[in-house]
Each structure stands twice: as structure tokens, then as C-alpha cells.
């Protein structure tokens, strides 16, 4: 088991989420599990995703909708295309 510490930007709506970025390190330090932080290909930080937007089965399958991931209204990863996510 490994922690996946996605980036978070408060649904691209709010500015007060700075403390949220520390939760991955906190969970890692209290569980002893290793943590990975998927990085953007342009080197600007972690890939932004949030719970509820993705579903996984723990065996390599992930479900997500294009409407959520590629939203022009709530941009999670500016400049990312469908191919970047795939």
C-alpha cells in the first residue's frame, strides 16, 4: 500500500487551502506508509485531483469523467489535455 498525494486547489474556487497540502506528509508520518506525489510534466508542481472526482479499484483501474477533469470553469491543471492525463 502506498499513499498517493495528489495536489489540491480547493476545487479551483477558493484561496484558503495552503494547509491542505501538508496532509500527505502528516498521514505518512503517522502510518509509516510511503508517499508518492505525481508531478506535472511541465515541472510546476503536483497533478491536481480531488476525492470524489476519481474512482479506483486498487488494481490499476481508474474512472473519471472528461467533464470534471477537463472543465473550463474549474481548471485543475492549466494546460493539461486529455492526452496528458491518459
Give the positions of each predicted feature:
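The feature marks the mature, well-folded catalytic cores of soluble enzymes
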Residues: 1-86
